[in-house]
């Protein structure tokens, strides 16, 4: 979704261009060049070689109905656009001929997906890009077919936030193909409509971005929004058609006050990513944040110095602490603020506990890189107190309590809240300082006696130095990478494991191919027993000396 927004970089100061430099035709040409520049045309020859005579590819199952990563969508989203780009950039007649066949196959069959996003945003976006790149070579029938597929009914629930911005960009593409100047002007105006403070969705007053209600979406819809708006702002800077100052300031502050906190050493915080737990997604999302920052710098924005200290996002039940050698985050939810999305378009099918007091801790940034398939129990999220082994379920994952207290003090800060769901109650508190994190829990009780209650101290990739520092009754110390974990509990109440595990992304991201993933995991837990009453815990996570 983020990549699709990058085509917006072709926009120019269109009013001035229309009047002085050839009008709409110039806009179409510049847009086509920018869209072509985004594609990896080195793949074009292989795509031509593997294409069947009817314009299809044998390795795509055209009956597939996966809602998230839809393999059929790759026909237009990747392959058709690559062929069209090879024609636009390199003048390859072979790729142009193949693009005509690929386009014809799609227009003949008009594949649909049960997820409205593909039909109304994703496919029209890709067809529009390909059509503009092939513009001078399109037949009248091809042009009509693309425009018809792009003229789709927009569901009312989609007309907010980044969904609305995507649809506005599609109207821009349609206007260029139809040579409809009024539609182009209207679409560009609509792109800016969502650059505003939102009461429930969009840019919130804590400088997080929400979508699907009061739900933090830093890494999904919010990142698409930041990328597309920053690129457009950069392109229009200095043209006489700049962003209105108040709109540009909102985009800049979203970057400065929000996104500048959530990445560490080229990796996005797991708790900021949202439901899209794809392979390498921490790295790719952080790279897109960096690209957005570079675009904003072209508008005169001054990138803030590296952030240090405690930052509480009060509309998002989320906090970040950054010190010289490490970063940590806490993610919670309330009856009002939704936790991490689950089961949306086959994404994050096991993530119901990811906002139950998750504590993610980073020194290298790679502590949780692609660890998700190796989690043997998705209730054992770092920092979370939960039922051990109880199956995760597909239902509302919100906390039943709304008592978060958080704030900074000097060079540190604190976050505490009460978690309650499924008969389990736990009061949890974290105190952050440059010396580390003090973690406390109290009042832990549970009504479901079928499962043991456990607090997960850590569930990360095992570093080469992972192991026991000392273990005795009352206090045990463990090390993993740059951190030492000191647990204050009886020895038999502390569970520690270094384990080689194997898993699959497709067990929680259902559209992933079933490719085995192997790795070594560091797992540390505090055991509270079954049906605890007023149980407690205490541990510290400190930088290793």
Go through each PLM region and give its residues.
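Extended polysaccharide-engagement surfaces of secreted carbohydrate-active enzymes
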Residues: 232-545
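Aromatic-lined, polymer-binding surfaces characteristic
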Residues: 29, 45-280
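N-terminal export leaders
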Residues: 1-3
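Bacterial N-terminal signal peptides
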Residues: 5-15
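N-terminal alpha-helical scaffolding segments that mark the starts
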Residues: 23-48
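Intrinsically disordered, low-complexity regulatory segments of eukaryotic
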Residues: 35, 178, 539
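Boundary at the C-terminal end of the N-terminal hydrophobic targeting segment
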Residues: 17-19
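Amphipathic repeat-derived elements
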Residues: 39-42, 146-164, 300-303, 333, ...
């Amino acid at each position: 979704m983020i990549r699709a927004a990058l085509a917006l970089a072709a926009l120019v100061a269109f009013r001035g261009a229309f009047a002085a430099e050839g009008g709409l035709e110039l806009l179409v040409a510049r847009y086509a060049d920018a869209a072509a520049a985004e594609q990896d045309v080195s793949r074009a020859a292989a795509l031509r070689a593997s294409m069947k005579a009817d314009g299809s590819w044998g390795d795509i199952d055209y009956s597939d109905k996966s809602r998230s990563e839809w393999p059929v969508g790759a026909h237009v989203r990747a392959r058709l656009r690559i062929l069209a780009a090879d024609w636009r950039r390199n003048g390859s007649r072979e790729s142009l001929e193949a693009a005509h066949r690929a386009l014809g196959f799609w227009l003949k069959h008009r594949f649909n997906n049960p997820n409205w996003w593909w039909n109304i945003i994703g496919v029209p976006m890709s067809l529009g890009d390909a059509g503009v790149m092939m513009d001078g070579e399109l037949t009248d029938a091809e042009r009509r077919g693309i425009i018809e597929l792009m003229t789709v009914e927009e569901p009312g629930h989609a007309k907010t936030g980044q969904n609305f911005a995507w649809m506005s960009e599609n109207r821009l593409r349609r206007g260029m193909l139809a040579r409809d100047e009024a539609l182009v002007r209207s679409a560009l105006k609509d792109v800016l409509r969502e650059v505003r403070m939102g009461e429930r969705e969009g840019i919130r007053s804590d400088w997080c971005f929400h979508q699907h209600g009061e739900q933090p979406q830093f890494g999904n819809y919010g990142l698409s929004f930041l990328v597309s708006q920053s690129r457009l702002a950069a392109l229009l800077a200095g043209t006489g058609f700049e962003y209105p100052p108040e709109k540009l300031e909102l985009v800049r502050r979203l970057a400065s006050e929000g996104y500048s906190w959530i990445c560490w050493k080229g990796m996005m915080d797991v708790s900021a990513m949202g439901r899209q737990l794809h392979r390498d997604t921490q790295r790719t999302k952080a790279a897109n944040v960096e690209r957005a920052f570079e675009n904003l710098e072209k508008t005169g924005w001054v990138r803030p110095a590296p952030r240090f200290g405690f930052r509480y996002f009060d509309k998002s039940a989320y906090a970040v602490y950054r010190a010289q050698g490490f970063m940590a985050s806490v993610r919670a939810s309330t009856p009002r603020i939704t936790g991490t999305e689950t089961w949306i378009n086959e994404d994050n099918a096991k993530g119901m506990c990811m906002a139950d007091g998750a504590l993610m801790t980073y020194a290298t940034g790679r502590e949780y890189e692609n660890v998700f398939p190796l989690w043997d129990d998705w209730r054992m999220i770092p920092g979370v107190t939960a039922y051990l082994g109880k199956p995760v379920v597909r239902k509302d994952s919100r906390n039943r309590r709304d008592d978060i207290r958080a704030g900074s003090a000097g060079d540190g800060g604190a976050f505490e809240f009460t978690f309650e769901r499924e008969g389990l109650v736990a009061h949890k508190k974290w105190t952050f300082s440059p010396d580390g994190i003090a973690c406390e829990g109290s009042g832990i009780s549970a009504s479901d006696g079928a499962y043991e209650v456990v607090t997960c101290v850590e569930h990360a990739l095992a570093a080469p130095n992972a192991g026991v520092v000392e273990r005795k009754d009352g206090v045990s110390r463990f090390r993993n990478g740059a951190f030492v974990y000191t647990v204050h509990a009886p020895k038999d109440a502390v569970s520690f494991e270094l384990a080689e595990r194997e898993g699959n992304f497709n067990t929680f991201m259902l559209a992933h191919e079933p490719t085995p993933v192997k790795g070594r995991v560091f797992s540390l837990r505090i055991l509270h027993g079954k049906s605890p009453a007023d149980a407690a815990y205490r541990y510290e996570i400190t930088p290793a000396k």
